[in-house]
Structure formats: C-alpha cells, structure tokens
C-alpha cells in the first residue's frame, strides 16, 4: 500500500542520512546504565521490507469499532467507508529525546553567537478535529497563502510524519514533490518524542538547507484535534 511505501522511504532516507553524517546537530548523551554514549537515533529500521509491513495489523480498527468510525461517517457524508491502514510500521516510532532551539534578536550577535536562520512567518490553526492529523497540511497551506507564496517557492519542507497518510495528504494538497519533503526521513523512522519533535525537525531543516546551500524552508507539525503549526524560515 502507499502508506507502507511512505514508511519504507522514511526508513531508507533516515538510514542514508545517518550513515552519511547529515545529522550533525545531534549532541551525544552518556548512558550510565549501559556505560556508553548514545550518538545516533536508534529507531531507524532500514532492513524492513514491504513483506514485513504487510504482516502488521491495523492499529486503530478496534477504536473505530467503538463508535469513532460511525461518527466520522456521520460528520462526513461523502465518505462511504473507512479503511484502517495504519500499523506500527507506518506510524511514528515511540522515542525518548530532547531538543534545544536558541531564539533571539540581533542583540545575541554581541554574545559571539552566529545566527543560522530567521523566522519569516508562523501560523497555528485548528482544522477539523475529527481529522486528527490534518492540521499539518492546513497550517502549511495557510502560511503560504498569507505570505503570497506557493509550494514552488520553498526549497525544502520538513512536515510532521504523524502517520504515513499525513505525508500523502501534504504531497497531494500542497503539490510537493517527494524530492523536497522530509528528505532525510521523518518521525516514522526517527521517532516522535513528545515536546521535542518540533525542535528536532527545525534543526534537521536548517542543517539540510546549509548542506545543500539552499535558502527557504517550511517546518510544520500536527497536533491532536486537527491542530497544526507551521514556520517559514530563511537561512542566513
């Protein structure tokens, strides 16, 4: 299925980026229990194949049967049926992590700090609450519209891979080619540590803009109940 292909792409891109040393913003953390340094993401599974993902059971089918599916069909009459396609293999990996983003104005330059990028615009909205992770595409679309831009004006997108269908929706709704979206893998491969994912994605985007000598990027995340937040950044 298409969702499984998105998941495999995320895994392979993340593995390649890790092996090539693209995740340069990772700060190693010492693990005293195992007496070792953790210096790379441990969720990446490049060995997975289509046959592995095909064996996994849909995770939300039981929840849908409790009445959630019926509510969706009532609220969205154009839907004829709901197909549960998300499994543990094409959903965000559970992970522990932390992220740090230093924000400031021009006065920081007096502290010997060199800015890497600046935020040009930001948008937060709540879309249809029943479409839980639809906010990512909606927030990005509004951000671009408000700035008089189209997706063609943006060099790279780092959009929250909260379930593979989110990536499919973003590509379709925003007309983004796979060559500009989550180019080093997303949270399906790298993990989704609550409260840290946004900062990690922003760091990944800036790193890749620098590596490719590109200028503009959009980073966006989804939240529950259709919430979405998007940032437009420019490399300095």
Show the residue positions of the predicted features.
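Beta-strand segments within the central parallel beta-sheet cores of soluble alpha/beta enzyme folds
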Residues: 2-9, 26-31, 113-124, 152-161, ...
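Predominant activation on well-ordered alpha-helical scaffold segments within soluble catalytic domains
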Residues: 4, 8-15, 50, 54-57, ...
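Short glycine/threonine-rich loop-to-helix capping motif typified by GTGT followed
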Residues: 36-39, 43-44, 129-136, 161-179, ...
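Phosphate/pyrophosphate-binding loops at sites that engage ATP/ADP/AMP, CoA/4′-phosphopantetheine
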Residues: 109-113, 141-156, 174-177
């Amino acid at each position: 299925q298409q969702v499984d292909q998105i998941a495999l792409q995320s895994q392979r891109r993340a593995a390649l980026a890790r092996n090539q040393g693209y995740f340069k913003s990772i700060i190693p953390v010492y693990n005293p229990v195992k007496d070792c340094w953790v210096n790379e993401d441990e969720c990446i599974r490049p060995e997975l194949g289509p046959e592995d993902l095909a064996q996994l059971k849909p995770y939300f089918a039981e929840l849908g049967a409790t009445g959630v599916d019926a509510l969706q069909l009532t609220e969205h009459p154009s839907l004829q049926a709901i197909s549960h396609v998300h499994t543990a293999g094409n959903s965000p990996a559970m992970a522990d992590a932390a992220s740090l983003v230093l924000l400031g104005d021009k006065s920081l330059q007096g502290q010997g700090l060199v800015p890497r990028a600046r935020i040009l615009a930001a948008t937060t909205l709540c879309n249809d609450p029943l479409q839980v992770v639809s906010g990512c595409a909606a927030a990005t679309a509004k951000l671009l519209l408000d700035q008089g831009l189209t997706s063609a004006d943006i060099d790279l997108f780092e959009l929250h891979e909260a379930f593979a269908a989110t990536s499919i929706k973003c590509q379709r709704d925003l007309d983004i080619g796979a060559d500009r979206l989550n180019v080093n893998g997303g949270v399906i491969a790298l993990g989704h540590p609550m409260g840290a994912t946004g900062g990690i994605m922003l760091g990944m985007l800036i790193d890749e803009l620098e590596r490719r000598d590109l200028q503009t990027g959009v980073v966006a995340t989804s939240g529950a109940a259709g919430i979405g937040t998007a940032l437009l950044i420019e490399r300095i």
